[in-house]
Amino acid sequence: NVSEFRCKCGQNHDTIINPELPEKLEQLYKKLNCSKIIINSGYRCTNHDKAVGGSGSGHHVYGNAADIVCYDQSGNRISSKKVSCAAQDIGFGGIANIDSSYTATHVDVRTSNFWRGDEVRTSSYSVTDDFYKYYGISRTDIQSKKTKNIILTIDDITYTGVLTEK
């Protein structure tokens, strides 16, 4: 659905989306076992990109980028530290934490000049080539855990719930 990627400027103009971006976002969704991914900013027209602090010629302007928040199956935000690690595994070209609470992540599908950022520290250069080392996260920490909805009846009382793989 392209509406999720529309520019937030309020103007009615075409939305440009690199088809690789939603494909990789779907991979990220599956890898993290998300309940949802909210796209806070996808495509941006040049004026809006500049208005929100961009250069006016960055990856959002070309439909290559999204600023996202991922949610787990319980509805909790997934740390951008974990999202960054998973995005690295999937092969996003640009990845960065973009807020001080570590809940929002920039991802893009650039094919050169890779960027691994943490805008809490700096927005102008890469801080690492490996988010696992940078954030001190084990690869097993971000593997999606399988969940299963269950219905159980005991003594004519029905219980419903979710089982999560350990």
Language-model segment annotations:
Residues 1-36:
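Active-site acidic/histidine clusters and adjacent loop/turn architecture
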Residues 21-24, 48, 64, 79, ...:
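Amphipathic alpha-helical interface surfaces
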Residues 34-42, 93-99:
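Surface-exposed patches in mature extracellular/periplasmic domains of secreted proteins
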Residues 151-165:
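Short, compositionally biased P/S/T/A/G/V-rich stretches that sit at domain boundaries
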